[in-house]
Structures are given as C-alpha cells and as structure tokens.
C-alpha cells in the first residue's frame, strides 16, 4: 500500500511569502467576460463574495489545516476527521469532479481565441465543430502529461506571465487609453449602478462566477503551518489576497463592460471582442496585433489546462491510498502519473462537453451551464468544509492547533455560519436561468443543469457504497508532501485548485 512521508518544515514563510505562493489565484482572464455582463455592479459582487465567502473559507481552512495530525491531506483529512470517511471521500471527490467540468469553460475560451486567430467563426459557433475541436485539444494536452510532469510547472509559469498576466495588463492599458480619449462607454458607473437590481432574480445568477473566482484558497491553507507568525500574518495575507482579487478582477471586468454592451458579450470570446474594439480605436494601424494577443491568451490557457490535468488526480490519489477506491485507481505509470484517475476525469469531461455543447447550442448557454455546474459541484465540498469546521469548534475545542480564528468560540461559529449561508445562497441562485437566456431556453438551462448535477452528486456515494474497502492496493508508492521549501520550480504559479499536494515517489525517484 502507498505510504505517506512526513517532512519537517522550517517556519520561514512570511506574510509576503505566503501572499506570493497564493497570488496566482487572483488572475482569471477567461472569467472577465462573465464578470462584465453584470456591468458596474461586478465590483459589488466581488466585495460580497470576498467578505462573506472568501475570508470565511480561508480562515476556517487554516484552522483545520493546523490541527495536530491534520496538517496533510487537505479537505479530505479535515472532513474525514470531523464527519467521517464517507463524507471525506465525497468532499475530495467533488474537488476532483469540479475540475473535470471546469475544463469546459476553459476549452470554450481556447476555441474563442482560436476562432479569432484562424478567422474561423464556426470553431466558436457550430456545436459539432466546437465539440470535435475541444475533444482533440483536451486529449492532446492529456497525452503531453502522461509522459510525466517534470516541466509542467515551468510551462505553467511561462503561460502565466506571457499568456495571462501580459494580455491582462495590455487589456487594462488599452481600456485606460480608450476611457481617457472620451470614447463612448457602454455602462454607467455611479452609486445607482453599483448595486444590482435585486428585483430581477436573473441578474443575481452571475454571482456564481464571482464565487468561482475565489475558489481554491483552501488548497493553500496547509502552508499556514510554515508561517513564522500565522496568528498575525495569515489574516493579513487573506485580506491582501481579497483586495488584489477585487482590484484586478474589477479593472479587468470593467475594461470589457465599458467597451462591449452586456447583451453583446460573447462569454467564450469576449476578451478578443474587446481587444478588437480597443485596438481599432486606439491604434487601428496595428489592429493585426489582436491576433498576436489572442495567440498569447491561447497559449496561456492551454498551459493552464495542461497543468490542471494531473494535479487534482494526484490529490485524489490519497483516497486510493486509504483503500477508498478500487485498486485499479491506484495504478501509476512509470512517470508517476495516476493514469486511471486522469483518464476517468477526462472521460467525465468529454461526456459533459459533448452533452452541454450540443444540447446547449454551443453558445453562451453552454458556457453558463458549465460554469454553474462547476460551482455547484465544488460548493458541495465547501458545505462539508464549513459543517466540519462547526463540528470541530463544538465537539473538539481541545485539539491543539497552531492557528485559531481570533475572538473565541462565538466568532468562530459566526464566521463558519456566514460562509455556509453564503454557499447555500450561491448554490440556490446557480439553478436560476440568467436574464440573457429567454423563452424555451430557460427550461433547457434548468433541466440540463439539474440532471447533470444530480448525476455527478451521486457518483462518489455510489462508488463508496459498492467498493469493497477490505481489498488493498499494493502500489509501492510513497507520498511526500510538497511545501514551500521542496516545491518544484514554478509550482506556485499553478492555481491552488490545480496543484498536486504531494510528490509521488516510486523506486526512489520523485515525480
């Protein structure tokens, strides 16, 4: 059976050090068009999600991650130790499954960029063409990862700087020039438009996109154990991360919202739409650079998808180690890649992609369903995280931990309940059709989302019920936790949701 090796960690991580290894989560260029559909109220949604959801998740996860004996294993360990192994298995499974669905909006973005580069609209509009192209890209990227992930983090680093950060700053700079020139702005930015129209329930659905942009912070909570002064520095780091996320996402989303009217934004290709308008206004003589920028964005998101393929499966591998999965899922190839877990995840992605793209028309509705489905699946894990934390506070107050949410038991419960209630609210509004989906499409939106969710929801519980956990997988694999001292180069440029929590050690070779 696989074993886990504990490694000592020097308490050397400072406030800025922790911020640096977590900051990659605040850049999500492919979500900017979705943000933009809410106009100036996107700032309100970002503040709401940051204060009522991001901060509670970060604080609760940090306290659980520093409980003696719970330092490794993440949400699986926390939920298993508070609610039981069945729920721990479900929680980590939902993290694994949400990545499978989360690939779909990213692939749609890639196809949107490709359609601009190749001047091939069908690639972004025709469902069959879109499906075939997305499947080819997905499995081609998977093949590059089966050979091992030695260079994955470095590729992700290059992709982050050249394909995410650089285009984002170009977008913001062009938008600033556009605004300064006195060009027409597609939205109003004042105190009235700051708040969404609460009388229109459909306008609230976009909140799920803002929740998604904050998801994954719990994956970095294990590094709290490495901080020299977690009680002081960790809450400040969370505040800095929230401010950075709000500032960058606000400016990025508004750069699109003020150029493209909300009802004309293409969620897959909205960034390229905006670059086209901005460049034609600011520097029409070099409008050809839009295709170059599109190529950078394409490479950035391709690098991101590639880097997300193996990491979550390695995280899920801990359940095979605990005999919660059939022995086949514990199999590794010679390069330390859990191929059965990776292939299973990609099969789920492929099936969902085919269904959503062809029944949803391959347009904004397909994108929105994939986005909402990703969120509701992941929220199921967060329900268990918050409930598990409440159990920890009420039933295990004497367990030693390095970090405590300040303020005592009452404050701890308030933080957890606020996070849980916000999660429930986000979960409910996810199933409401957005305003830009009208007529018969609203029924299709709800039906597709509900059925897809119920199928995915059932998977972990069915597998847990039918699997004989007495069988043992003899893999000869050792798991070595990754920390800030031994992490591979470029590891922290991966989004926290996509990072592998441990090395795979086989035959004395670390993967």
Curated annotation (Swiss-Prot):
Catalytic activity: 4-aminobutanoate(in) + L-glutamate(out) = 4-aminobutanoate(out) + L-glutamate(in)
Membrane topology: Multi-pass membrane protein
Compartment(s): Cell inner membrane
Sequence ranges on the Periplasmic membrane side: 36-41, 115-127, 179-200, 261-291, 357-366, 434-445
Key word Membrane present: yes
An example Gene Ontology molecular-function term: antiporter activity
Transmembrane segments: 15-35, 42-62, 94-114, 128-148, 158-178, 201-221, 240-260, 292-312, 336-356, 367-387, 413-433, 446-466
Protein name: Glutamate/gamma-aminobutyrate antiporter
UniProt source species: Escherichia coli O6:H1 (strain CFT073 / ATCC 700928 / UPEC)
